[in-house]
Structure formats: structure tokens, C-alpha cells
Amino acid sequence: MEDAHDQSSRPLSFELESNHHSLRQLTPPICTSYPSNENEDVSQSLLPAPLNDRYPPISSQWPPGTIQQNPSEDPHQQTESEVASQTSWQRRQTTKSGSGLRRYPTRRINLVQGSVLSVDYPVPSAIRNSVEAKYRDSNDATAEEFTHLRYTAATCDPDDFTLRNGYNLRAAMFNRHTEILIAITYYNEDKVLTARTLHGVMQNIRDIVNLKKTQFWDKGGPAWQKIVVCLIFDGIGPCDKNTLDVLATVGIYQDGIMKHDVDGKETVAHIFEYTTQLSITPSQQLIRPQVDNPDNLPPVQMIFCLKQKNSKKINSHRWLFNAFGRVLNPEVCILIDAGTKPGHKSLLALWEAFYNNKHLGGACGEIHALLGPRWEKLVNPLVAAQNFEYKISNILDKPLESAFGYVSVLPGAFSAYRYRAIMGRPLEQYFHGDHTLSKKLGKKGIEGMNIFKKNMFLAEDRILCFELVAKAGYKWTLSYVKASKGETDVPEAPPEFLSQRRRWLNGSFAASLYSVMHFNRIYKSGHNLLRLVFLHVQLVYNICQLTMTWFSLASYWLTTSVIMDIVGTPSATIKNKGWPFGNDASPIVNNIIKALYLAFLMQQFFLALGNRPKGSQTSYILTFLYFAIVQLYILILSFYLVAQAFSGGNIDLDFDNGAGGFVGSFFTSTTGLVLIALVSTYGTYIIASILYCDPWHLLTSSWAYFLGMPLTINVLNVYAFCNWHDVSWGTKGSDDTASLPSAKTMKSVTQKSFVEEVDKPQVDIDIDFECTVRRALSPWQEPKEKKEVQLEDSYKTFRTNLVLLWTLCNGLLALLINNDSVRNLCLTTTSTDRTAWYFKVILWATSGLSVFRFLGALWFLGKTGLLCCFSRR
């Protein structure tokens, strides 16, 4: 570990290892039918390399549809389809020849330090020729990064990915300073979501490169050489293979070159490196440079890390910070989830926050929901509610915490950290949640944690934020950057929504308790007295929030009951009438609503304890609808209270004793408190949104959020706490083992280790690339999810309904017998009379059943004795 720190602290001082140069020198010369300079005619080329018309217009039909090829020349054409993409991809990994039975020649690849396999592969001609000449021929660039894809089979733990062990990255090999390291973490997103993120990142890099009056980016080399983009895919099995075609089209991936193991030592991560100017939009349009166009994308240094096994997001971050970060030593690391699209100049705004504040350790931008064309997704109440929730969080919560200097959570989907700020204890605590370190850490790792700590690591970003602010001897702060915006997709169906919020709620609750219980560590930091005062104020605020969350279930029920009783129950004292159904009907309707409220709430416990959300969608949808209706009813009653109060109606406010009497009654009466709560809640939403010049969510999404407020308490909180034992990430997928070839080493005459690698001709590389581009640019079709209810789900659903029916019947009987409020529905007027009658019925029924059983026993005994006398011997 010390060696890793030493080397990461001086990434520009080491000499390039001769092994790496020898690898590049051993790369065979390119044999291709493509033109090698820009003056040659390419009208007959297989792919429209951007040379004949100097970058022809962008078209989604690249390569042109007029190209015909014999199916026998493409060994993969027969198997390409949405259904068989996994099988087809595996088949391409083991294919050794591109046409017929012809075998390719091989070349020797020397291993770095005798153990590290790192190979340079020629890229397709169309990709190589798409690089602008001003970059390709520049003295500041190295031609190899545009002509060859570098592949490294990392057979080590991320902590062992060091220069001493023979691992290196191109940006460090070329002695480049990395100012920004942008990490895109991926699980199983489709190619549209991935392209949305990657293209948005490349557009943001163009914004930085095109800065004109800058005192920083123009010094010490071109700006694009100071930025590295790292894509980290969490496992071969879960990843969408169509997404790999998109990456292959822009040049940062190739089929058939990955190795499952090196001499039996399994590959942990497959690392690809390439510098590209190509990009694909979410609509599958290929973006290529055009002649002297200032809007061209600059070269982008790419690292693609494809982990062999699914090992969760924390492990992906360990590859980022402990492996790539130590080699590149960036100033700022920006974290983006696949599917999140950074807005215009958003990454620049994040970086500027660090550049202008030397004590800033972490920052986040504004995340808003993806609403689709013409905001069509707002029709979905779940999407609309989440959109409003995100907006209010960005308008009220994040600015408040930023003012204190401690943002409790920097969303992993769109945030940034100063690399040297999180080094040390913050990352050490953060990585305790990595499952791959469980054996190494022992009791300090995930296996030695109790269920509370395991839930805490479901919101591991909160732990990192607290550890960063509390870092001993430093005064790092966290901030919210309003100018930086990111757009992300949100769950659109109840099962995905419940699974996501279960992880968020349990993780944030546990992490909040962690920060409160360990607040004394703040005193060891380097914060000044004023900052400590702010942090103490925030501590009190967080404790109040935790307390409100803990008692929210009872609080909402009591609030609902009180409002219904105030408005619906007639009172002789203040001479008000029952509303809205009159004196007689209003209490009855309210009691029915309360009974159903408790019934649906009870149902949530049964569903949460025994059923999967996917197996109980209908029950959850009915629950959502009912609680939304109840909330609408309560809102109507609340605004009726407001109208009555300001119109001088018969509400418990003092209008007869002047302003003093009115103010006194306003702050002491139940009606006044309801009015204060309404104005302070909804009023702050409206005023703050207008002040931030962002009021549109009030018109488009507030309806869904306000109607869905009881869902957060009665459904989400119940589901989260009932599944406290579940410490999974609530995602789907599996660890499919891909069949990749192995690398076997041999010894040369000089006893140097080498492997023999297929030396594929450039023509065959280009033919395979044509097929890849066709797959990548084909229109995306959303997969149709099979709505099949598993047999186990059907059993659990029946079990839940049976227990619920049994409980409700017993509860309803107890309510009817023992509650005075339902006297209008019964024959008697008091619960005492009903209880007496019920007690008599129970006694008579018990006695009758006992006598009946006794008579049956007597009959059996007499019958047996009588038959015994007359039975045959």
C-alpha cells in the first residue's frame, strides 16, 4: 500500500517501461485495402472511411445499406438477433478466423514483468481514418493511441494494479497530467441509456476544450490530454451485449481479444484503452468529425474496464480510485451512472467549483428526472412524483446543507470528489462494504458486520461524505453546484420503485444514524469555530429529521384522523356542522375511511414480509389508488378549513376579541395549527420554486407528489423496514460465465515469457467491424418484459390474502362490538350492550358446542359397547 501511495504521488516522474515499448514495436505492420492518405479515392471501400468527401454527412445508415455480402463471409450473421445476443456474443469471442477455414498467422507478445498480458491491436481503418489530421499528426499526440487499441488482462485485485506489478495506463505512459477523471459506472443498461451518458460526456469535454479565455486548460499541452473517461462495467454476464457493439463502433472495444485467464490465473478485469473522436447519440446516429468544423468532438482518452464477474458498484469504485486513480493521480474524479446525461457545460461547472475553492472536497449537481419527448412521461404518476421530489430536493434540501458545508449525500449518479481529499480513511471506510474484500478484512469487512452496518452500506455515498468532512486534520467541505445539471431515468413501475426506495430508505436511515453517533470525530478535523457551529446546527436538524421519520407512521395517521374529526364531526361547542356529507353521514363515511385505511396499512405489512413486489403488483396499485384518494380527501378538508378560517366561519378561532384574541387562538387551536402547517409546507414550495426561476414542476408534477405523500410513509417505509434483513441492491441480473479463451505462456530462448496471439489481417478486421457497426446503429427496440407470475409468487399471494382476510374479519368484528363510534350502524346504541350480547352468544355457543361434542362421544361409546356384544367372534 505504501508503494502504491508513493507511485501515485509522482505519476509524471517515472520512466516508461521498455516492456511497453517492445509491445508496440512488435505490433505487425498494417495490411489493409483502405487508402493510407487523404488524397486517395475511397469510393470503392467497404466502409465509408472519412477520406473521399472529407467526412461525409452523418447518417444512421453507416455503413451504407447498399453493401452486399455473402453470408458465408460473415460467420456471425446467422445468429444476430435480440433473443440470441448473448449466445452470439460468446460465439464471437472464440472465433479465430474471419472467413471460411483459413487460419491466421500469429505473433509473439512478451509479458510485462513475465506476468502481465498487455497487447496492442490495430483498430478498424474507418476508426483510424476518422481522426482529424491536426490531432493525428500533432507533436503533442502519440500516433499509437489513434491507431491501436490497448488491451490489458488484469489478473489482480484493484489494490495491486500498480506500476511495480507491471500495470500501467496510456495517459501515464505518455507523461500526461490528468486533471479530470470521469467515471461512468454501468450495470445492465441498454445501449440507448449508455449512449446518452457517453455522448453527453463527450459534448461536455468539447465545452472544456473549446474554452477561449482560460488561464489553466491551455497550459502544459492540449486540454483534451488532461481529461480521461473511464467506463467501468460491473460484470460480463449482466451487461447488454448491444452496448458492447456501441463501444466497439467508437473504437474502445473489440470482440475476440479478451482472455479468461493467463496461465490459469483468472482475469479479474479486462481493460481497453483508446483515444477516439467518434460518438453515437441515443438515437443511434454516428457522430464523426467534419472538415474545419468547430463543433467537432475533440479526441477523448478512453479507458474501458469490463469486470469479469459482477461484484457490485463499490468494487467498481475501488477499481476507479485504488487502481486507475493511483496510476493517473487526477485532481478531480467525477462519478456518473450509466443512464445519467450531463447537461450543457455541467462537468465544467463541477470542475470550476473545485478550481475556485481549495477546501472543497466534494460536490454534486442538480439531478432531474428524464421526462421524455414533450414531457410525455409526466402522465405516469410515479414519474411525476419523483420529478417533483427531485426538484424540491434541489431547491430546498441541497442548498440548505450546502450552506452548512456538509451535504449529507452526494448522489453517486452525478457527483465529484477531489482525489487527494478522499484518499486515506474516507476511502478505507467506504470500501469496507466491498464483498471482494471480505476475506482480507475479516471482521472489519462485510462478513463481520451486523445487519445495521450492512444496511448502512446500501447508502455508501453518505458514509463517504461524512468521512470526508470529518477527516482528521483537514477542513474539507461539500457543496451543491446549481449550474451543473444531470438528467437520469427513474423507475416507472411499482416493483422497481419499491426495490430502489427500499435500498435508499434503509441505507440513508442507517447512514444518518452513523453520522449522528460518530459526530464527535468532527472535533478532530481542521474546521474553524464558525464551521463547527454550523455543523452543530445541522446535527440538531438531522436529529429532528430522524425523529420525524421514525414516528411518521403514527403522525400521518393521527393527522388524517384529526382533520377528519374537526371537519366531519359536528360539535355543539363551536356550533359547526359535519362536512361534506352532513351531520349524520360525515362521521360514518370518515369511520369507513379510517377502517379501510388501517386495513390497507395492515396489508402492507403482510405484503412486505412475505411477497415480492413483482408478484403483488395489483395489490400495490390498489393501495396506491386508495391512499391517493384518502390524501385528496384530506387536502379538500384542509382547504375547507382555510376557507372557513378566513371567511369567519364557525371554526375554533376567536374573532370576537380583536387581533390579540385571534392571534392567540390561531396559535393554540387545532385549526390554526393546521393552517400553519399548510402554509409553511405548500407556501415554501411555491415561493422557493419561483425564487429559483424553476416553477414548472409545480404545474406539471405537484399533483402526483401531493397525492402520493402517504405512499412514502404507509408503503415505502413499511416495505423498507420489513425488509431490513435484505441488504441486496434491488437490481436484477446474474453472473453468467462467458466462454472466453485462455492465454498460455511460453518461454523464449532468452527465458522471457510470451504468448502467441492471432495476427488478424486488416481486411478481416474491417469486415468484422462492418457487422459490428450494423448492429450498433440498428434501431433499438425496447424489450418486452414477460409478465409471468412464478408459481412461488402465486402461493405467496394466496397465503397473504388468506392471512389478511382472517385478520380483517377478526378486526372488523372487534371494531363493531367494542367501538362506540359505529353505533349508528348497529341495533344497539352503546358498546356495553353489544359486548354483553356478544358475551352471551359466546357463552351459549361454547356451551352448546361442548354439549354437542359430549353427546357425540356418548353416542360413540354406546354404539361401540352395543356392537361389541353382538359382533361375530
Swiss-Prot record:
Keyword Glycosyltransferase on entry: yes
Bilayer topology annotation: Multi-pass membrane protein
Entry EC number(s): 2.4.1.16
Cleaved signal peptide residues: none
InterPro entries: Chitin_synth, Chitin_synth_fun, Chitin_synth_N, Glyco_trans_2-like, Nucleotide-diphossugar_trans
Location(s) in or outside the cell: Cell membrane
Protein's UniProt keywords contain Transmembrane: yes
Cellular component, GO annotation: cell septum; plasma membrane
Domain of life assignment: Eukaryota
Alphabetically ordered keywords of this record: Cell membrane, Cell wall biogenesis/degradation, Glycoprotein, Glycosyltransferase, Membrane, Transferase, Transmembrane, Transmembrane helix
Membrane-crossing segments per the record: 532-554, 588-608, 621-641, 672-692, 702-722, 802-822, 841-861
GO MF entries: chitin synthase activity
Effect of loss of the gene: Reduces drastically spore production and leads to strong retarded radial growth rates. Increases total protein in culture supernatant over threefold. Increases sensitivity to AFP, a small, basic and cysteine-rich peptide that exerts extremely potent antifungal activity by inhibitiing cell wall chitin biosynthesis.
GO BP terms, alphabetized: cell wall organization; chitin biosynthetic process
Known function: Polymerizes chitin, a structural polymer of the cell wall and septum, by transferring the sugar moiety of UDP-GlcNAc to the non-reducing end of the growing chitin polymer. Plays an important role in septal growth or maintenance. Mediates colony spore formation.
Family: Belongs to the chitin synthase family. Class III subfamily.
Entry protein name: Chitin synthase F
Organism of derivation: Aspergillus niger (strain ATCC MYA-4892 / CBS 513.88 / FGSC A1513)
Gene name of the encoded protein: chsF
